């Protein structure tokens, strides 16, 4: 059936019992118009033109919609949208049933003409609808009916008054700051003021639906207004921040507002907060995420926080996710939304099992300019939202000056999310009253638009005059509301003591961070670990594991039934995870190929080779008290790491791990590392214990499969803000994971960066006997046995470099050389190394050996520490690659030559 025939078959066009015959004739007509009688040719030709008109209105009506408060663009090549364009007229259309326009119009309108007038008004009004790109027929049909069925936001007079007051507070706040703190940056909301009522409407609808957790992410534009009027941060606190006095004196004592602060702090328009309120019988938690100036980067963080609020992790097996528990609202800028790739990465998570949040509400605060850049230079598309079409989501463009239309857009969006659990994008089309910031003069670069913007009335005035004309309020009441806002702001301002300046020049980190990550000293019996291991190697009856894989897994019995059996890296991880789950700490591990492991080592999710069904052994740990969640991530780094960071911030009990496919690719997440993971606590008091597994080692695989850029993480390390390790022992890995898990949801929690192994995953030197797992704890340095009075040279190395040196030394033993594995690079184990060196009376030389070039790796970081330890007592030497622009050689054979030379030179004892 053709689309045109389908439209006719769905439309009650008074064909009655002859519908089937008429449809067949219509098909004949479409193939050859002369094949049907002349009277039907006329009818079918008219119907065909009507359907094309209708289709054009639905598909292109947005191009003529009244969505621009000021400076409407000049459209070129707008498709035909008028009745006359299709050789139709009023009389002809009045003779056709309204059902031909749309089946749901049949009982509403008398004829096609009346229905088309309604469609024109609807699709060319203050909301421009884009949904015909959606592939799902059910979703598209639902939107069509919802949009075309007569509907108007019905606000009674009291609600209209309340809405006007809300706008008066929004604009009055900006005007007060503009007048009293001249030139101070605040990134005003003016021009898209309706954002605040839209957020309030969303939160109210969510409360009525029982959604208890609202997660909001936004950049700096309008943020202060959202803080004060959505999270209800007191005016006194906000004005205090402009006056550089202590705002915390005005924090509500009832606990309804939670604000955290770091010791170095951040600018006021980056800060977030959490508001708790009882609304319509629902105790809601409304969170505005802290955010850096890197536009849009908070989007995946908000998604992760939302998913954490939706997941039940305090149970055995996998988490259960209830999308009704929480919802994300992400506020974008019109220049940044199409300009920043993080948005596409984040939207791609929307329907994935491991990341879905049941639909995000995206609001573009579209002031039609990015700093000084106008749309013609900012994007290659008609709208900034066009990039969202690829994700099959509806897009509503709404005039920011029509407040009631903005409310309606929210209503439809929330209904769609509830029905389909998918994202919706609302493009709030307004303008920017001032420059990018309040010190900027926009007329320097954008003189013509700003001539009109300066003449344009504010939405407060536009809506106020509308209510005056409707008789809802009087002119005097309108001005009285506006004056009342200024009075309240002045009263708040007067409460602040100008002399009460904040004085904290030292900005000391909290005492809880004075120490490194503390070892977890819990011991386990042999039988306990054997019980866990047996459970992990027990599968459902009839489950068919690939024979080749089964042989690998069966070897994991050997540490418990053979004297020389060793626990390799992957098995150590499985045992650690299982004991952590028994302790009641949930684990979430994601990354590209993480279920199996890039290097085919983990096998956390098994696949039946005959049916394809999966089985996850870590869902079946004896006495398991928390969930294990593992997902192969999409081929994304930034959004996935941001998601895991957000998840862990929201659920601090969760042991979140992101694993890079290769550590080399982690730098795609550098913004998350720089602006969130390593600095969030110092800036915002926001704690995270996210763990990174970054495969790192030089194995002849070239410059893009060798280095996780260890040097960059060490550069970010300060104030005990993280733990950075490069391990050489599977048992130390076991104890490290347990220590990290034990620190979660405490003041001691911090990120953990693991330079994880590749070839060492199966190296017997790294594998350890089971008795190293039953007791002890994480060791920051490791050494072999030695005779102190024979050692003249100490070699400090880390990770695979240590193992290479150890294996080389085993071939040519030299008691004068002592190898020391620096397992924990940050915090640097000064005390442990100093104590070791003090035991060596004949020591002459200390050498640092690394795989990486001299300007990379750990050398530049460790040098100041080692220099102090060596002082004038010993010689200090470096062995490693020379300074290089690229991390590693491209040719495997050249790699071997260079690597062997480093080892040879390092082991020479002069």
Curated annotation (Swiss-Prot):
GO terms of biological process kind: glycolytic process; tricarboxylic acid cycle
Domain of life: Bacteria
Cofactors demanded by this protein: thiamine diphosphate
CDD domains associated with the record: TPP_E1_OGDC_like
Pfam families for this protein: E1_dh (PF00676), OxoGdeHyase_C (PF16870), Transket_pyr (PF02779)
GO cellular component: cytosol; oxoglutarate dehydrogenase complex
Catalytic activity field: N(6)-[(R)-lipoyl]-L-lysyl-[protein] + 2-oxoglutarate + H(+) = N(6)-[(R)-S(8)-succinyldihydrolipoyl]-L-lysyl-[protein] + CO2
GO molecular-function terms, A-Z: oxoglutarate dehydrogenase (succinyl-transferring) activity; thiamine pyrophosphate binding
Keyword Transcription: no
Keywords of this entry: Glycolysis, Oxidoreductase, Thiamine pyrophosphate
EC number(s) given by UniProt: 1.2.4.2
Assembly and binders: Homodimer. Part of the 2-oxoglutarate dehydrogenase (OGDH) complex composed of E1 (2-oxoglutarate dehydrogenase), E2 (dihydrolipoamide succinyltransferase) and E3 (dihydrolipoamide dehydrogenase); the complex contains multiple copies of the three enzymatic components (E1, E2 and E3).
Role, per record: E1 component of the 2-oxoglutarate dehydrogenase (OGDH) complex which catalyzes the decarboxylation of 2-oxoglutarate, the first step in the conversion of 2-oxoglutarate to succinyl-CoA and CO(2).
Family: Belongs to the alpha-ketoglutarate dehydrogenase family.
HAMAP family assigned to the protein according to its UniProt record, in alphabetical order: SucA_OdhA
Protein name: 2-oxoglutarate dehydrogenase E1 component
Name of the gene encoding the protein in the UniProt record: odhA
């Amino acid at each position: 059936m053709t689309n045109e025939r389908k439209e006719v078959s769905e439309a009650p066009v008074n064909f009655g019992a002859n519908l089937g015959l008429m449809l067949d004739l219509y098909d004949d007509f479409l193939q050859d118009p002369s094949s049907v009688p002349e009277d039907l040719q006329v009818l079918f030709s008219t119907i065909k033109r009507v359907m094309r008109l209708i289709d054009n209105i639905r598909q292109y009506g947005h191009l003529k919609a009244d969505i621009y408060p000021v400076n409407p663009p000049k459209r070129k090549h707008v498709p035909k949208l008028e009745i006359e364009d299709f050789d139709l007229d009023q009389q002809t259309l009045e003779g056709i049933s309204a059902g031909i326009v749309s089946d749901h119009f049949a009982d509403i309108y008398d004829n096609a003409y009346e229905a088309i007038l309604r469609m024109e008004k609807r699709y060319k009004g203050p909301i421009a609808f884009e949904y015909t790109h959606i592939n799902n027929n059910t979703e598209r049909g639902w939107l069509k009916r919802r949009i075309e069925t007569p509907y108007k936001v019905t606000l009674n007079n009291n609600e209209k008054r309340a809405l006007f007051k809300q706008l008066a507070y929004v604009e009055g706040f900006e005007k007060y700051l503009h007048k009293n703190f001249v030139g101070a940056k605040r990134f005003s909301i003016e021009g898209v003021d309706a954002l605040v009522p839209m957020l309030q409407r969303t939160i109210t609808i969510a409360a009525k639906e029982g959604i208890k957790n609202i997660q909001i992410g936004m950049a700096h534009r309008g943020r202060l207004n959202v803080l004060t009027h959505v999270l209800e941060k007191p005016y006194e606190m906000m004005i205090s921040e402009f006056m550089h006095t202590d705002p915390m004196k005005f924090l509500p004592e009832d606990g309804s507002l939670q604000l955290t602060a770091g010791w170095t702090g951040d600018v006021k328009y980056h800060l977030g907060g959490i508001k708790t309120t009882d609304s319509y019988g629902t105790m809601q938690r409304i969170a505005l995420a802290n955010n850096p100036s890197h536009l849009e980067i908070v989007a995946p963080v908000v998604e992760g926080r939302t998913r954490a609020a939706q997941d039940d992790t305090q149970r055995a097996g996998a988490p259960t996710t209830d999308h009704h528990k929480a919802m994300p609202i992400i506020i974008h800028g019109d220049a940044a939304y199409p300009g920043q790739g993080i948005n596409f990465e984040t939207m791609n998570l929307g329907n994935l099992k491991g990341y879905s949040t049941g639909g995000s509400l995206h609001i573009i605060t579209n002031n039609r300019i990015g700093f000084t850049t106008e749309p013609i230079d900012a994007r290659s598309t008609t709208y900034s939202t066009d990039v969202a079409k690829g994700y099959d989501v509806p897009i509503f463009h709404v005039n920011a000056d029509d407040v009631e239309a903005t409310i309606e857009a929210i209503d439809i969006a929330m209904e769609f999310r509830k029905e389909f659990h998918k994202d919706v994008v609302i493009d709030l089309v307004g303008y920017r009253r001032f420059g990018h910031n309040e010190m900027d003069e926009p007329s320097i670069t954008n003189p013509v638009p700003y001539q009109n913007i300066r003449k344009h009335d504010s939405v407060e005035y536009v809506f106020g005059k509308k209510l005056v004309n409707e008789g809802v309020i009087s002119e005097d009441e309108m001005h009285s509301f506006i004056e009342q806002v200024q009075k309240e702001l002045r009263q708040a301002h007067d409460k602040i003591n100008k002399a009460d300046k904040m004085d904290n020049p030292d900005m000391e980190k909290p005492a809880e961070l004075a120490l490194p990550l503390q070892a977890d000293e819990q011991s386990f019996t042999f039988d306990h670990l054997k019980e866990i291991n047996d459970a992990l190697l027990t599968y459902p009856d009839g489950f068919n594991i690939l024979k080749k894989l089964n042989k690998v897994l069966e070897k994991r019995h050997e540490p418990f039934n053979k004297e020389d059996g060793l626990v390799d890296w992957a098995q150590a991880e499985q045992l650690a995870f299982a004991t952590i789950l028994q302790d009641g700490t949930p684990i979430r591990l994601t990354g590209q190929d993480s279920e199996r492991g890039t290097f085919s080592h983990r096998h956390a999710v098994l696949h039946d080779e005959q049916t394809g069904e999966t089985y996850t052994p870590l869902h079946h740990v004896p006495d398991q008290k928390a969930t294990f969640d593992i997902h192969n991530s999409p081929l994304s780094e930034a959004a996935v790491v941001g998601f895991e960071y957000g998840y862990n911030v929201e659920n601090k009990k969760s042991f979140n791990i992101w694993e890079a496919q290769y550590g080399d690719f982690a730098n795609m997440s550098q913004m998350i590392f720089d602006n969130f993971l390593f600095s969030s606590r110092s800036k915002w008091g926001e704690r995270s214990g996210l763990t990174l597994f970054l495969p790192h080692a030089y194995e002849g695989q070239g410059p893009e499969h060798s280095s996780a850029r260890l040097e960059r993480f060490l550069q970010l390390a300060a104030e005990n803000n993280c733990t950075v390790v490069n391990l050489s022992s599977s048992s130390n890995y076991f104890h490290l994971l347990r220590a990290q898990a034990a620190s979660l949801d405490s003041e001691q929690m911090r990120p953990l960066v693991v330079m994880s192994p590749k070839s060492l995953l199966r190296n017997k030197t790294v594998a350890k006997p089971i008795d190293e797992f039953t007791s002890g704890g994480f060791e920051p340095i490791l050494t072999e046995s030695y005779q102190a009075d024979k050692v003249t040279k100490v070699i400090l190395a880390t990770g695979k470099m240590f193992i290479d040196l150890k294996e080389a030394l085993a071939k040519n033993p030299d008691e004068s050389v002592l190898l020391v594995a620096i397992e924990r690079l940050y915090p640097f184990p000064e005390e442990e190394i100093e104590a070791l060196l003090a035991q060596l009376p004949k020591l002459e030389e200390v050498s640092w050996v690394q795989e990486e070039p001299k300007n990379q790796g750990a050398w530049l970081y460790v040098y100041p520490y080692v220099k102090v330890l060596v002082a004038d007592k010993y010689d200090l030497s470096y062995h490693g690659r020379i300074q290089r622009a690229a991390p590693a050689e491209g040719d495997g054979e050249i790699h071997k030559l260079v690597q062997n030379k480093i080892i040879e030179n390092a082991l020479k004892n002069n």
